[in-house]
Amino acid sequence: MKASMYLALAGLVLLFVVGYASESEEKEFPRELLSKIFAVDDFKGEERGCKGFGDSCTPGKNECCPNYACSCKHKWCKVYLGK
């Protein structure tokens, strides 16, 4: 009984120490996250010359990116697995 109480107490102390140590790193996390989100947003404005997975397409026009093919049945780009 005493051993399990000491083990639980040691676990709580370890959890507190790890949480306190990572707290300083977490203060910078929101700024880094926002900068990454806005950096990704800049790339959304650029259009590709081809259509990716799930984009609508017209069969026979070769609009899909490499390794994708336009499905005649569903009319969207899907992964081309060969014949």
Curated annotation (Swiss-Prot):
<keyword id="KW-0960">Knottin</keyword>
<keyword id="KW-0738">Voltage-gated sodium channel impairing toxin</keyword>
<keyword id="KW-0528">Neurotoxin</keyword>
<dbReference type="InterPro" id="IPR013140">
    <property type="entry name" value="Huwentoxin_CS1"/>
</dbReference>
<comment type="similarity">
    <text>Belongs to the neurotoxin 10 (Hwtx-1) family. 15 (Hntx-3) subfamily.</text>
</comment>
<feature type="disulfide bond">
    <location>
        <begin position="57"/>
        <end position="70"/>
    </location>
</feature>
<feature type="disulfide bond">
    <location>
        <begin position="50"/>
        <end position="65"/>
    </location>
</feature>
<feature type="disulfide bond">
    <location>
        <begin position="64"/>
        <end position="77"/>
    </location>
</feature>
<comment type="subunit">
    <text>Monomer.</text>
</comment>
<dbReference type="Pfam" id="PF07740">
    <property type="entry name" value="Toxin_12"/>
</dbReference>
<keyword id="KW-0027">Amidation</keyword>
<dbReference type="GO" id="GO:0017080">
    <property type="term" value="F:sodium channel regulator activity"/>
</dbReference>
<feature type="propeptide">
    <location>
        <begin position="22"/>
        <end position="48"/>
    </location>
</feature>
<dbReference type="InterPro" id="IPR011696">
    <property type="entry name" value="Huwentoxin-1"/>
</dbReference>
<keyword id="KW-0872">Ion channel impairing toxin</keyword>
<feature type="signal peptide">
    <location>
        <begin position="1"/>
        <end position="21"/>
    </location>
</feature>
<keyword id="KW-0800">Toxin</keyword>
<dbReference type="GO" id="GO:0090729">
    <property type="term" value="F:toxin activity"/>
</dbReference>
<protein>
    <recommendedName>
        <fullName>Mu-theraphotoxin-Hhn2p</fullName>
    </recommendedName>
</protein>
<dbReference type="GO" id="GO:0008200">
    <property type="term" value="F:ion channel inhibitor activity"/>
</dbReference>
<comment type="function">
    <text>Lethal neurotoxin. Selectively blocks tetrodotoxin-sensitive voltage-gated sodium channels (Nav). Does not affect tetrodotoxin-resistant voltage-gated sodium channels or calcium channels.</text>
</comment>
<keyword id="KW-0732">Signal</keyword>
<keyword id="KW-0964">Secreted</keyword>
<keyword id="KW-0638">Presynaptic neurotoxin</keyword>
<feature type="modified residue" description="Leucine amide">
    <location>
        <position position="81"/>
    </location>
</feature>
<dbReference type="GO" id="GO:0005576">
    <property type="term" value="C:extracellular region"/>
</dbReference>
<keyword id="KW-1015">Disulfide bond</keyword>
<dbReference type="GO" id="GO:0044231">
    <property type="term" value="C:host cell presynaptic membrane"/>
</dbReference>
